[in-house]
Amino acid sequence: MEAQNQEVAALVEKIAGLHAAISKLPSLSPSAEVDALFTDLVTACVPASPVDVAKLGPEAQAMREELIRLCSAAEGHLEAHYADMLAAFDNPLDHLARFPYYGNYVNLSKLEYDLLVRYVPGIAPTRVAFVGSGPLPFSSLVLAAHHLPDAVFDNYDRCGAANERARRLFRGADEGLGARMAFHTADVATLTGELGAYDVVFLAALVGMAAEEKAGVIAHLGAHMADGAALVVRSAHGARGFLYPIVDPEDVRRGGFDVLAVCHPEDEVINSVIVARKVGAAAAAAAARRDELADSRGVVLPVVGPPSTCCKVEASAVEKAEEFAANKELSV
């Protein structure tokens, strides 16, 4: 335990030093200095770590929250820079690999698709929303081109300039792919009836950076998505929580969803993935009662078989609570 505490303390000290250096940068636009500092930060955060960011002291928590905001801003500058670079080509989609982290998006999108088809049986999406698509909508593009060829994608971002950059990438694109990608400038909080039309909604990691903001976004989606529709939420785990917000699966459940899987990759894919399904009011109330029963009996959610070697998946709380209750009754 003492060794773990020392490891966590050393990591937090290192990250605090990087935060201090990044905070002093005159600009977060791509440059040799910016790239070097964020590379060091990612290198420090990606390996498995015993750190639990929820248990950090107030000063470290404030540092972490500010660091996530800085990461978000730097990511926006980086994506805008490469979106402009790619748009200079006659067919931008032929040059996506020039973006240094394109492979990560390919792997993350494949992971999300694999989890979706495994834990939402029979799903065959025809309408998909991606909330927080940004100027480089790689996730939607990879999903549309390689995994969901029959689906139409509506991409939402609050920034009109980001959407304009995204549209330019599809100049000269295959008519089928280009026709299936639409971009809308809107805050998710203003979307109501539109959300009920989607079979799947993907929620980007940086939409709602504070825990209460993220919970509010998820609750809004739960209030307006159709019963049975799937929600895919990007989160983080361990030290990766210094780079992206961590989403509590309980906030997803409280938002009106049945959490089907929680996956924490252990490779170069930084984001964790939560797959959930919208349930009706009656089912949500019943699930809440079962969860309360499970909590009162001390049920610990087990880890079940992973869909790949890079992650661990948490089973549905509802199913496990029911299984525990059934076994308990049989033993009485």
Swiss-Prot record:
Keywords linked to the UniProt accession: S-adenosyl-L-methionine, Transferase
Tissue: Expressed in roots.
GO biological process assignments: nicotianamine biosynthetic process
One Gene Ontology MF term: nicotianamine synthase activity
Superkingdom, taxonomy of origin: Eukaryota
Catalytic activity: 3 S-adenosyl-L-methionine = nicotianamine + 3 S-methyl-5'-thioadenosine + 3 H(+)
Induction context: By iron deficiency in roots and chlorotic leaves.
Enzyme class: transferase
EC numbers for this chain: 2.5.1.43
Record's keyword annotation contains S-adenosyl-L-methionine: yes
Record flagged with keyword Transferase: yes
Pfam families in UniProt: NAS
Family of this protein: Belongs to the nicotianamine synthase (NAS)-like family.
Function: Synthesizes nicotianamine, a polyamine that is the first intermediate in the synthesis of the phytosiderophores of the mugineic acid type found in gramineae which serve as a sensor for the physiological iron status within the plant, and/or might be involved in the transport of iron.
Name of the protein described by the UniProt record: Nicotianamine synthase 1
Organism from which the protein derives: Oryza sativa subsp. indica
